[in-house]
Curated annotation (Swiss-Prot):
InterPro entries: NqrDE/RnfAE, RnfE. This is Ion-translocating oxidoreductase complex subunit E. The chain crosses the membrane at residues 18-38, 69-89, 92-112, 125-145, 182-202. Keywords: Cell inner membrane, Cell membrane, Electron transport, Membrane, Translocase, Transmembrane, Transmembrane helix, Transport. One of its GO terms (cellular component) is plasma membrane. The lineage of its organism: Bacteria, Pseudomonadati, Pseudomonadota, Gammaproteobacteria, Enterobacterales. It is an enzyme of class 7 (translocase). Its EC number is 7.-.-.-. Belongs to the NqrDE/RnfAE family. It is found in: Cell inner membrane. It is a multi-pass membrane protein. The keyword Cell inner membrane applies. The gene is rnfE.
Amino acid sequence: MNDVKSILVNGLWKNNSALVQLLGMCPLLAVTSTATNALGLGLATTLVLTLTNASISAFRRWMPGEIRIPIYVMIIAAVVSIVQMLINAYAFGLYQSLGIFIPLIVTNCIVVGRAEAFAAKNGPLLSALDGFAIGLGATGAMFVLGSLREILGNGTLFDGADGLLGSWARVLRIEVFHTDTPFLLAMLPPGAFIGLGMMLAVKYLIDERMKRRAAKPVVVEAAAEKAS
């Protein structure tokens, strides 16, 4: 149970691939112009991470150490191809929006990094959980950044959700405020960098506050021991 909790906390917060490791910056900055695109690529990446981690862990005993990286890439490429075909079949609008960034998951440092750092050393179940947690953490960061940029840029949220979830999802579209002229800075790459910087700053402040709260009982206990 402790292992499961540690994996989830590390993947979602402490070792977040986007906000701590700063991996996968290319899709993170390029695709997060809307919340829907960010959520779509994030979920695809999570699925790839979960399946590749489990597969690599299951076959790790039969992988020669000298050629393990090419084998990882072949497994990742096979899983990405399957995910790409599924998105093409069931979410064609999203497939068109994400474009080249779906096959580029193969070269994403997050996927290869978790295969080498965790899946090659642990069992399939824990490896699948690690991939799921890391992917969910990256998806959360993408979604927050995509939502921030979409709201500031277009004044909407979940615009184009029907491309990901089907025609019923048109009702999810929210017009936060009306604008006749989009705020281009938020929609272009500079806005992605600024938004990511703000998210990094907020995470740093939260972590520092949590550290101070955790340190207070220790200080009080030490003071009580001195007094006695």
